[in-house]
Curated annotation (Swiss-Prot):
Gene3D superfamilies: Aminomethyltransferase beta-barrel domains, Aminomethyltransferase fragment, Probable tRNA modification gtpase trme, domain 1. The glycine cleavage system catalyzes the degradation of glycine. It comes from the Bacteria. PANTHER family: AMINOMETHYLTRANSFERASE, AMINOMETHYLTRANSFERASE, MITOCHONDRIAL. It is an enzyme of class 2 (transferase). Its EC number is 2.1.2.10. The glycine cleavage system is composed of four proteins: P, T, L and H. Belongs to the GcvT family. One of its GO terms (cellular component) is glycine cleavage complex. Coiled coil: none annotated. This is Aminomethyltransferase.
Length: 373
């Protein structure tokens, strides 16, 4: 099947992007270089095209109640203008996908409630099929909310200043995981237009994710870059999220790993009376304990551990690297991996098979990097 292009495909090429296929899309892997882009986000700000992500609305009577049957997080902890990170689960408690749920409140003339979900590109169709199948009796409308539009991620400590400079709008009143819809205009797009903006991201930095129409998206992209924001590709997005200890679906989490095993137990609210798919499996795991856990590893020396590299302990195979890279911020090799529970204590030494040699790796505290305000 031919890979799809985002509306910013040509715009990214004009900025010097090197493209790769990712989850069925042609996406920029880098522009000026991974390390430069990574450091720009850590120190200033960077802009990502994430229009490959799935964005869907679920609208009708009590959509949060309906979605609550599919996720382990208490969705009633958020209200209009707020959002939360959670996961879809199968019957075994395995993770079908991770997603963000945004409560849009009642914004329809029919007085219907609406929530927005943002899901991973490679899981989009399977996720929507799963949701529609299990909510088929709820009389809800599940619609593609992105259409042919653009989804941008502006990330970094200077993000708020950059948006204020370009949009002329102060966004300091949007808290972390807050969101709102606002009317704005640009120098190159003088007709005012609506954007959905959320203070969310996948880098470990402050930042925003912005949904808007294609023409406005192209204009905003160009004006931010002209204002000094660095265009960034998936390469930097991966190293940034890895340093921040954020899992990547298909690598660090999948339908055979549970939230407790993945270090996402904080997403599970078993104390609520709500029933959800996978709850029984998670209750059982709470009572019996877990056999493996996703840990952070620091690789000694200059070696880089990649996905699939074998991990040994006392000459026995004990696991595989799920994600690994060189950390531009820490200047050392870092990785994530599932290890047997008795090897997950911080400071434990294991060995990673990198090419033909065994390299020592030390279990470290997650995340590798955390922004100090």
């Amino acid at each position: 099947m031919k890979s799809k292009n985002t509306p910013l495909y040509e715009t990214c090429l004009n900025e010097g992007a090197r493209m790769v296929e990712f989850a069925g899309w042609n996406m920029p892997i880098q522009f000026s270089g991974l390390i430069n882009e990574h450091n720009a986000v850590r120190k200033n700000s960077g802009i990502f095209d994430i229009s490959h992500m799935g964005v869907f609305s679920i609208q009708g009577k009590n959509p949060k109640d309906a979605l609550q049957t599919l996720v382990p997080s208490d969705l009633h902890r958020i209200g209009p203008g707020e959002a939360c990170y959670t996961v879809l689960l199968n019957n075994d408690g395995g993770i079908i996908d991770d997603l963000i749920v945004y409560d849009l409140g009642t914004n329809d003339p029919n007085n219907e409630e609406c929530i927005l979900i943002v899901i991973n590109a490679g899981c989009t169709q399977a996720d929507i099929d799963w949701i529609k199948e299990h909510l088929s009796d709820k009389n809800l409308k599940v619609c593609n909310a992105k259409g042919d539009g653009v989804l941008l991620a502006l990330q970094g400590p200077d993000s708020t200043n950059q948006l204020r400079n370009v949009l002329g709008e102060s966004l300091t009143n949007i808290p972390k995981f807050g969101h709102r819809e606002i009317q704005v205009q640009l120098k190159t797009h003088p007709v005012s237009f609506s954007i959905f903006i959320a203070r969310t991201g996948y880098t470990g930095e402050d930042g925003y994710e912005i949904l808007l129409n294609t023409n406005a998206g192209k204009s905003l992209w160009r004006e931010l870059i002209e204002n000094g924001v660095t265009p960034c590709g998936l390469g930097a997005r991966d190293t940034l999220r890895l340093e921040a200890g954020m899992p990547l679906y298909g690598n660090d989490i999948n339908n055979t790993t549970t939230p407790f095993e993945a270090g996402l137990g904080w997403l599970v609210h078993l104390e609520t009376p709500d029933e959800f798919i996978g709850k029984a499996a998670l209750v059982k795991q709470t009572n019996e304990g877990i056999n493996k856990k996703l840990v952070a590893l620091k690789i000694e020396g200059r070696a880089i551990a990649r996905k699939g590299y074998q991990i040994m302990f006392k000459n026995k195979f004990v696991g595989e690297i799920t994600s690994g890279s060189w950390s531009p911020t820490l200047n050392e090799g870092i990785a994530l991996a599932y290890l047997p529970i008795d090897l997950t204590k911080i400071g434990t030494a294991v060995s990673v098979q990198i090419r033909d040699k065994l390299h020592t790796a030390i279990v470290a505290k997650k995340p590798f990097y955390r922004r100090v305000s």
